[in-house]
């Protein structure tokens, strides 16, 4: 990364570095500058030059150019804040693919402004951490659990703070960190240190400072990225630290409204939630014995939609809900039209994220162009005693064929449709809206280590986290962090994985679950999700291509092994998760419920996997699910790396923010420009192959977006007039299922005649 700075030119008083009493001139006369405290003083060009030199130190930029750009914007009565903003604007305007380091200059200047504002408001910057903690606990801003540490321990911890870490952010990262995550009068390293101390507060008193320092250094050096709920909520009283939830509705009012209430509680705390509605009776079904009385799943989905809008994550943004429906449900055709502009607006839900759950039997019929039967779960349940939503694999296939053999005799409410035609309708909706998400139910459940206690109905909001869900008993919940691969080498994986797993296991003790079913799941399964971001950076730094599957396999084997091994070591220390007896883990199966023989045949280091299997059978494992790769669209900007495990959309582009146009580029663009393949021109089959390779070493899921460029000549250079067609997209989606991917998140498209150069805004993957 970029070199850190030994010290910044910060004055000990609240005066600004842009102003002072020394002689300074501009255009032949002395300009008066308004300081942050409201006083006036002559402009001091020397101090401006010192700040500019500091912001440019060690970067491949010309500081004189920045100073020259500023001088044209100086005027009588200008404030030091305006000078600072003008410096930032100049730096951003000079940023380009040839000079990408200007975004780091702008980031440092933004942090400088934060330091100065904090000095003015509270009278000190870094150096008085104990005072900060005491003040914020008194004001109700910090959780009082931080005071389980003694004053001496807090003073010692304050000495770990390294303000140079603040200067490693580019402008996008600095702005996001300060605007989204910091409390009033709080500096970045204070926030990160407080998180680390709280994460370690559940450790043994004689070891917690040791762990707190390891946590802090991993977070502050951006080797581990905390998920938004942890970074935003851990410091505040009563915060939920959980990112992902899944609930399921029974076919009765008590369950339906109970889960809507639970979704509201989740949204209030900033989490995203998946809601499975497959048990709910279809449109035209019976209600209290009356035929053709049910309105189906759409009215309940609309209620969830409106709940997400009303309970807006503490005023930060609208809630986020994905509604999952099994593809055999009679309401699937209307579900696919639920976000179309035409039709009855009372049966529309534009703000939720639809998800379809697909069994293998459906996919086989799609490939073979066979018929598919849509049925009413209520009629099937009442007349045949089958709860179809709970079945998967061979059990589902047998029950489904039995249902089909009883059409017209027993089952009267149904619809026959060609499976291929239904899949085409799904694809059309995806191209138009990006959704529905697709969850491959059998693939997900075959890899479920807790089959002995239930099944997985679908995925969470981002399609990477899922485990058993039982309506009214257990609601899936998972706490997340991600490894920042841009800042890691292979030899770092073991140590950082141990820290990440331990951190997340501690969050289970610290979080405040928003409802009883979530607490029950937390206690029973202890599900966590260690993810990854910056794969594109890791590959580019090593001059590797995105289709270098052997290297990708080696990297994620290390992550999978060390995260699993770390959870086993925690079980030695703290005990196995309560649902471990009878699980696939106890039977000696490993990641994805695969036997040791698979690892002996496919792993780079097969012998360690056999030992790990034996150790887990002997000692247990602390967490039922351990790894899950989230999309990380925003948090990757704070981390200064590319999002998740996907290629970059574009090597360099400008994003439109409230603060103006912001340049976005990967960290190693200066030296590795051509080793960042652009997703907007990449054959998406390469993405599927890479995700499938990573999935082998990931026990939960991966947020896999697919981006299809519909312009001519992109994928077929030998046929410049040819553009992607429906069959190409169809083949890619089927390939994802066949390759063992568990879900497909968004389908993005670059529309015809809307193709942008790298320097233009990102039009296809804005989040």
UniProtKB/Swiss-Prot annotation:
Broadest EC class assigned to this enzyme: oxidoreductase
Catalyzed reactions: a 2'-deoxyribonucleoside 5'-diphosphate + [thioredoxin]-disulfide + H2O = a ribonucleoside 5'-diphosphate + [thioredoxin]-dithiol
Cited Pfam families: ATP-cone, Ribonuc_red_lgC, Ribonuc_red_lgN
Keyword set, alphabetical order: Allosteric enzyme, ATP-binding, Deoxyribonucleotide synthesis, Disulfide bond, Nucleotide-binding, Oxidoreductase
Composition bias type Polar residues, residue spans: 9-26
Residue span, ATP-cone domain: 31-120
Similarity comment text for this entry: Belongs to the ribonucleoside diphosphate reductase large chain family.
Record-given protein name: Ribonucleoside-diphosphate reductase subunit alpha
Organism: Synechocystis sp. (strain ATCC 27184 / PCC 6803 / Kazusa)
């Amino acid at each position: 990364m970029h070199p850190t700075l030994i010290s910044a030119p910060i004055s000990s008083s609240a005066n600004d570095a842009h102003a002072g009493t020394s002689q300074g001139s501009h255009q032949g006369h002395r300009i008066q500058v308004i300081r942050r405290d409201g006083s006036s003083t002559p402009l001091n060009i020397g101090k401006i030059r010192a700040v500019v030199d500091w912001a440019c130190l060690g970067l491949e930029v010309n500081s004189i150019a920045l100073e020259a750009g500023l001088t044209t914007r100086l005027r009588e009565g200008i404030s030091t804040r305006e000078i600072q903003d003008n410096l930032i604007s100049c730096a951003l305007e000079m940023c380009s693919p040839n000079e990408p380091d200007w975004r780091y200059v702008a980031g440092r200047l933004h942090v400088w402004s934060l330091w100065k504002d904090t000095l003015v408001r509270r009278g000190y910057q870094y150096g008085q951490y104990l005072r900060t903690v005491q003040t914020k606990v008194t004001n109700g801003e910090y959780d009082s659990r931080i005071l389980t540490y003694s004053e001496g321990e807090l003073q010692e911890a304050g000495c770990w703070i390294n303000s140079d870490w603040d200067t490693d952010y580019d402008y996008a990262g600095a702005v996001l960190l300060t605007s989204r995550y910091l409390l009033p009068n709080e500096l970045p390293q204070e926030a990160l240190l407080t998180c680390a101390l709280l994460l370690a507060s559940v450790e043994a008193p004689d070891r917690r400072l040791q762990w707190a320092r390891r946590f802090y250094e991993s977070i502050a050096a951006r080797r581990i990225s905390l998920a938004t709920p942890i970074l935003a909520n851990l410091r505040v009283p009563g915060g939920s630290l959980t990112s992902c939830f899944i609930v399921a509705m029974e076919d009765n009012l008590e369950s339906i409204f109970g889960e809507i209430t639970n979704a509201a509680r989740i949204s209030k705390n900033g989490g995203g939630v998946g809601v499975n509605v497959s048990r709910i009776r279809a449109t035209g079904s019976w209600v209290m014995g009356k035929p053709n009385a049910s309105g189906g799943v759409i009215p309940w989905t609309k209620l969830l939609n409106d709940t997400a809008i009303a309970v807006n994550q503490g005023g930060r943004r609208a809630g986020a809900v994905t509604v999952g429906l099994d593809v055999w449900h009679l309401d699937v055709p209307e579900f696919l039209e639920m976000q179309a502009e035409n039709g009855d607006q009372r049966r529309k839900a534009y703000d939720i994220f639809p998800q379809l759950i697909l069994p293998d039997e459906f996919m086989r019929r799609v490939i073979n162009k066979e018929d598919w039967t849509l049925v009413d779960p209520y009629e099937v349940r009442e007349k045949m005693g089958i709860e179809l939503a709970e079945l998967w694999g061979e059990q589902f296939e047998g029950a489904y064929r039995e249902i089909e053999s009883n059409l017209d005799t027993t089952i009267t409410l149904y619809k026959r449709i060609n499976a291929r035609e239904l899949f085409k309708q799904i694809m059309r909706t995806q191209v138009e809206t990006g959704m529905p998400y697709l969850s491959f139910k059998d693939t997900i459940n075959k890899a479920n280590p807790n089959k002995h206690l239930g099944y997985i109905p679908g995925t969470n909001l981002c399609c990477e986290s899922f485990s058993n869900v039982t309506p009214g008993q257990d609601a899936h919940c998972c706490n997340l962090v991600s490894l920042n691969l841009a800042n890691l080498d292979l030899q770092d994986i073991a140590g950082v994985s141990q820290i990440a797993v331990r951190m997340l296991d501690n969050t289970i003790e610290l979080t405040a679950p928003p409802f009883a079913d979530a607490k029950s799941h937390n206690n029973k399964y202890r599900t966590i999700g260690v993810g990854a971001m910056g794969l594109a950076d890791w590959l580019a730094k090593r001059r590797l291509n995105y289709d270098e599957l052997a290297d990708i396999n080696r990297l994620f084997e290390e992550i999978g092994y060390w995260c699993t091994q770390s959870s086993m070591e925690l079980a030695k220390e703290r005990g196995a998760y309560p649902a471990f007896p009878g699980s696939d883990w106890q039977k000696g199966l490993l990641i994805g419920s695969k036997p040791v023989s698979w690892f002996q045949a496919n792993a780079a280091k097969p012998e360690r996997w056999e030992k790990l299997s034996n150790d887990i059978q002997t000692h247990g494992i602390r967490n039922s699910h351990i790894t899950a790769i989230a999309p990380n669209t925003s948090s990757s900007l704070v981390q200064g790396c590319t999002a998740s495990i996907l290629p970059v959309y574009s090597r360099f582009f400008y994003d439109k923010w409230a603060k103006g146009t912001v340049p976005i580029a990967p960290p190693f663009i200066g030296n590795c420009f051509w080793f960042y393949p652009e997703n907007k021109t990449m054959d998406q089959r390469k993405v599927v192959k890479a995700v499938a390779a990573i999935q082998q070493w990931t026990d939960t899921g991966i947020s896999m977006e697919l981006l299809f460029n519909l312009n001519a000549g992109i994928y077929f250079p030998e046929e410049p007039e040819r553009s992607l067609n429906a069959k190409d997209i169809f083949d890619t989606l089927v390939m994802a299922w066949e390759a063992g991917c568990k879900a497909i998140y968004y389908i993005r498209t670059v529309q015809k005649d809307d193709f942008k150069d790298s320097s233009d805004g990102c039009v296809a993957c804005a989040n």
